[in-house]
Amino acid sequence: MAGGSLAPAGVAKERAEQYQGKVTFAVFVACMVAAVGGSIFGYDIGISGGVISMDAFLEKFFRSVYLKKKHAHENNYCKYDDQRLAAFTSSLYLAGLAASLVAGPITRIYGRRASIISGGISFLIGAALNATAINLAMLLLGRIMLGVGIGFGNQAVPLYLSEMAPTHLRGGLNIMFQLATTSGIFTANMVNYGTHKLESWGWRLSLGLAAAPALLMTIGGLLLPETPNSLIEQGLHEKGRNVLEKIRGTKHVDAEFQDMLDASELANSIKHPFRNILEKRNRPQLVMAIFMPTFQILTGINIILFYAPPLFQSMGFGGNAALYSSAVTGAVLCSSTFISIATVDRLGRRFLLISGGIQMITCQVIVAIILGVKFGDNQQLSKSFSVLVVIMICLFVLAFGWSWGPLGWTVPSEIFPLETRSAGQSITVAVNLFFTFVIAQSFPSLLCAFKFGIFLFFAGWVTVMTAFVYIFLPETKGVPIEEMIFLWRKHWFWKKIVPGQPEVDDSRESMEMGEAVASRIK
C-alpha cells in the first residue's frame, strides 16, 4: 500500500476549513525578501564551478592543477582530481553544517529574523574575503564565512516562508526559496561567462558579487516582520495576532490563531527540543528530516551545479563552450522552478517527487551510455553527441528543478510541530550540508575512478529515493502546518509507530465539525 493513498482532505479538514486569509501584499513582499537568502545560496553553488575553470584562478591558488590541465596527457576524467581544489568548494558546506546546529536555538529563542540577519552579515564578510584573497588561507576563510551564512540562512528562511504563507498556498510560496536559489545559480553562471574574459581579475569579480544579494538579505531581515508563530512562541501573543491579521488580510483568524496558541503552549513546555525530537511520536518527521535532504543531494545534482564547467571540459568541451553549457543548464533549472510553483499545491508533493525521479533516472542512464560508448581517453564526443549530452543533462536538471530541488526543502519545513520545528529544520540543513560536503569533496576523485559510471551511481540512488517516497511519504498538500500530526496517525505505516489517542482526535474533529455547522446556522 502506497504511503499517500490517504487523501489529505481527511486530516483535520473541518479545522482547516475555518482558516481564512489570502495572499496579501504584506506576505508577498515578506516572502520575496526572505527568499533572497536562497539566491545567495544559489550564487555560491553556481560560482565555484566557473571560477575553478578559470586559468588565472588556478594558477594563483592551485598551480599543480593548472599545470596538469595545461600540459598533462592523462585520463580526461581526472583533470581536476585534487583534494585542495575540492576543499575550496566543500569547505563552505562543512562550515554551514556546524553553523546550522548553532542556528537552531537562535532561531527558536530570538526569532527567524535574527538568523536571517546573522546569515546576511556572514555572507557579506565572506564575499569581501574571497574578492580580496591573496593566498589560499584567506580564500578558504572567506568560504567558511559564506558557509556560516548558509547555515543560518537555510535554517531560518524555509521556516519563515512556511509560517508566513496561507495553508492552501504554502507549497508555492515556500518554493520561492528554491526559485531564488535557482535564480542565484543562473546568475552565477552568467557572471562566470562574462568574467571569464577578464582573465587576471575576473575571478575576483565573480566571488565579490555575492555581496550584492547578501546586502539585500541583511537589510531585508531588519525590515521584515517576525512570523506570528515565532512571536507567539516568545510570549508576544497580541503582537503575533496583529501580524497574523495583517498577513492574512482579515480579522477572522481565530481558528489559526488558536492552533498557534496550542502549539506554542506545547512548544514552551519542551525545554530540550533536540531530545524531544528523538521521541517515538516524532519518528516520522525525524526520518523525513534526515532522508529528504540526503536524497536531494544523492540525485547527483551537485555534480552539475558545482562542477558543470570542469565536467563539460572533461567531456571535451572548450572553455567557452563549457561555461555556455553550464549557463544553459542554470537557465533550465531556474525556469523549471516555476513549474513546481504552479503545480505543487494542485498535483501534490508525491506526484512531483515520483515523476521527477523517473525522469532523472532515464536521463542519467542515457548520459552514461553515451559517454561509455562514445567518449574515452583517446576519444572526443562528436558535435551531435555533445549536443545530446547537454540536452539530457538539461532534462535531468529540469526534472530536479520541479521535484527534489524545491520539495527537498519544502516537505521537511512543513511537517514538524512548533515545539521541534527549529530543531527539525536544523537537522534538515545539517544533513543536507553534510552530504553536500561529502559529494563536493569526493566528486573529482569519484569522477576519476568511476568515469561515465558516475551517472549510473547516482541513477541507482534516485531509484531508491523514488521508491521511498512512494512507500513512506504521505501527501501534505492542503494540510495545515499545525495539524500534520493527524497525517502520521492515519498513514498505513507510520500509525504503527506514532503513539496517540485517535479516539480523542476523532472527538476533537467531531466537536469542531459541530461548531462549524452551528456557526453556519447562526
UniProtKB/Swiss-Prot annotation:
What's one GO-annotated cellular component? membrane
Gene Ontology MF terms in the entry: monosaccharide transmembrane transporter activity; symporter activity
The protein's matches in CDD domains, at most eight in alphabetical order, are given as: MFS_STP
The protein's matches in PROSITE patterns, at most eight in alphabetical order, are given as: MFS (PS50850), SUGAR_TRANSPORT_1 (PS00216), SUGAR_TRANSPORT_2 (PS00217)
Q: Its membrane topology, per UniProt? A: Multi-pass membrane protein
PANTHER family recorded: SOLUTE CARRIER FAMILY 2, FACILITATED GLUCOSE TRANSPORTER, SUGAR TRANSPORT PROTEIN 7
**Protein's recorded name:** Sugar carrier protein A
From what organism does this protein derive?
Ricinus communis (Castor bean)
Gene symbol?
Answer: STA
